Structure formats: C-alpha cells, structure tokens
Design a protein with these regions (language model features):
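The beta1-alpha1 cofactor-binding region of Rossmann-like NAD(H)/NADP(H)-dependent oxidoreductases
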Residues: 38-39, 59-70, 103
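Residue(s) in the substrate-gating loop at a strand-loop-helix junction
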Residues: 140
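Conserved glycine-rich Rossmann-like NAD(P)H-binding loop of the short-chain dehydrogenase/reductase
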Residues: 29-44
C-alpha cells in the first residue's frame, strides 16, 4: 500500500488537470491520471515522475459509470488506497441558444460536467470513507451566472455545486467542496475565443478575446496549486462550500506548501 496520499485526477491530460497532477507530484503524492487521451496522459505521467511523484494512467471517459468504476478499482489495486478525488474533467460545449441546441449534445454536457463527478464519487465512496477522504469538484463562475448560449455548461456547474452540498451533508466524515478556478488560459478558453463566432453574442466573444490579448487569463498553474492543496489538506470546515481558488485561506497555505514554481 502506498504510504503517500493517493489522488485521482480527471481531465488530467492537459490544462488545469495536468497542472494539478504536477503540483501533487511535487509533494510526492501518487496520482491516477484519468482522461480520454492515453498518449497525452503518458506525457503528463513522465512529468509526474520527474517531479518526484508516482502515477497510474487510466484511459477513461467520465461520462461512463463503468469506466469510472474501473478507474477506481485499478487505482485501489495499484496503490492500495484512495485518499482524494479531483473531479476536473469538463466541456463547455454545446454553445448555442436553448432553442437551437441539439438535445443529445445538451445531455452529453450534463453527463460529463455533472454525472462524471457523481460516477467517480459513487465508485470511490467506500475507499474515501476509509481514509476520511477529500473530494474537490471543479466548478465555475458560470454556476452562478446566466451566460447566453451556454445553458448546458451553466446548468451542469450549478447542479454540481448543489450536489456537493448534499454530499457534504450526507458524508460527514468526508470533506467535499467545489472550487471556482477563475478564468484560466486553457483549451476551454480557446474554444470560446475561436470556435464560437456563430454561437455566442459578439460582445461575449470580444470579452474573451480581450482577456487573452491583455494577458489577463490566469496560468493553469496558479489555480491548480490551490486545487492540489485542497485535495491534500482541505479542512473539514470547507465541506459543502463553493470556494474561490484565490481565497486567502487557500492560496496562502498552498503557496507555503508548494512554493512559487513547479521546479
């Protein structure tokens, strides 16, 4: 059995999830990397090893409960325990007004952004109870906003926040929370800037493009450091909360534990 904390991170092949895995590796944690692209996961696994952590690569689609259960079972078999989950996998599509949205696309968004977290938690709940585990569900400011042409994304994230409140009420031995990672320089932002011309209002697209041009997008490493800290150290009083990544109660101790840079 691993003597280090074992954390499952979904959406770990790029962007925020990959950065979370790297920070966890710097602390020496064992990380199960979950995403749909095995090739990209293997690249992140190499980074994890260089930074002092150990990893397990599991190719899986979080919208499939059986795939999530396999990820949990494989982690348990490999490391002997599961201490934390970081449910980061998410998609911003479909981007269209409600009247024009394909029902199958809308359903798929909810399956990834909401059901994916439920599936992994459901599969891992016994292991997490055993180790008084932590669950960090990555949400969004969109959970509290009405963004035109992003109804599925907004709905999924809002539901994720309330699901996490219920989870925290039911599982008093666990620490379960949602976190807003801010506006991060990831592939999701690239989609909003470059692939939404016929979907989003023009002023909304202009706003996203200005964020990039002005250098106002947060590097993934900054919110990822906060999320990694929460996965390892989130106190019980955070359970059920929707927290900002730059909340001083998180960002300050995260900086103290991990330092300013990954290397």
């Amino acid at each position: 059995m691993s003597e280090k904390p074992v954390v499952i991170v979904t959406g770990a092949s790029c962007g925020l999830g990959a950065a979370v895995a790297r920070w966890l590796a710097k602390s020496g944690a064992a990380v199960t990397l979950v995403a749909r692209s095995e090739e990209k996961l293997l690249e992140i696994a190499a980074d994890v090893g260089r930074l002092g952590g150990s990893s397990l690569v599991v190719k899986a689609d979080v919208s499939d409960f059986h795939a999530c259960r396999t990820a949990v079972e494989t982690t348990r078999d490999h490391f002997g325990r599961i201490d934390s989950l970081v449910n980061n996998a998410g998609i911003v599509q479909p981007l269209a007004p409600i009247a024009d949205t394909d029902p199958d696309d809308w359903r798929h968004s909810i399956e990834v952004n909401l059901f994916g977290s439920f599936y992994l938690i459901r599969a891992a709940i016994s292991d997490l109870r055993r180790h008084k585990g932590r669950i960090v569900n990555v949400s969004s400011g969109a959970a509290t906003m009405a963004l035109e042409s992003a109804s599925a994304y907004c709905t999924g994230k809002a539901a994720l926040n309330h699901f996490t409140r219920v989870l925290a009420a039911e599982e008093k031995g666990l620490t379960a929370l949602t976190v807003r990672p801010g506006v991060v320089d990831t592939g999701m932002q690239a989609v909003l800037r470059n692939e939404a011309d016929n979907a989003l209002p023009a002023e909304q697209i202009a706003y996203y493009r200005q964020l990039k041009e002005r250098g106002e997008l947060e590097p993934p490493e900054v919110p990822a450091r906060a999320i990694a800290w929460l996965a390892l150290y989130a106190p019980r009083e955070f359970s059920g909360k929707f927290l900002d990544y730059d909340d001083p109660r998180i960002s300050r101790p995260a900086l103290e534990v991990f330092g300013e840079t990954l290397v």
